[in-house]
Amino acid sequence: PRGVIWKIIPDDKLKILVIESREPIETPKRYRNEFGQLLEHSPFCERDIVTPKHNPSLATGQVDVMVKLSDGIQKYTYLHHPFDVVGWDGYYYPYAFNISDFMPITGKIHQPPPVHQTFQSKNFVVCSFVPRLFDYHPNSIPAPYAHSNIDSDEIIYYVDGDFMSRKGVKKESITYHPMGLPHGPQPGKTEESIGAKETNEFAVMIDTFKKIN
């Protein structure tokens, strides 16, 4: 979140897709009650949110802090480490959500993209495609139909697995469909989906409500 100093310490090699917003990024309103608690039909719950871990061994000595201001980054040198604290107070802190904890919503026939929604902001939404059962009506066609997002640019980052509607898309690939451009499953993928029971895919989709510059 804006105005909070944070640091990621990966256990292994890490590649990151960064999504930045000038407006707050939050859980979808339809997943919450009037008090902000996630409801039972939400595809994830508060227990899935991972909070920071304090590591005192890192909080020593002088340190450089990179601060993003508008479209630039400035470096500030702190004489004392900002993590040299006992803890934090309040509810404003960095957090993590593992896409593997997203519980997919499925149906007898093909469900619309909003069932995959994970986060929302003023000008875009973030969706998670995860391993799930395919549509289970006897006559269902699991592959999505061709469509055109009249008011949205669509970006999909393919994290892992075999994406149900694409061919030749490898791990860490990105596809981009500008608003108004008709698109859908590649040739043969619709027929291939008929009779399939499940999909094994991990992907993150960003649908914007303004054109991407």
Labelled PLM ranges:
Residues 1-213:
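Jelly-roll (double-stranded beta-helix
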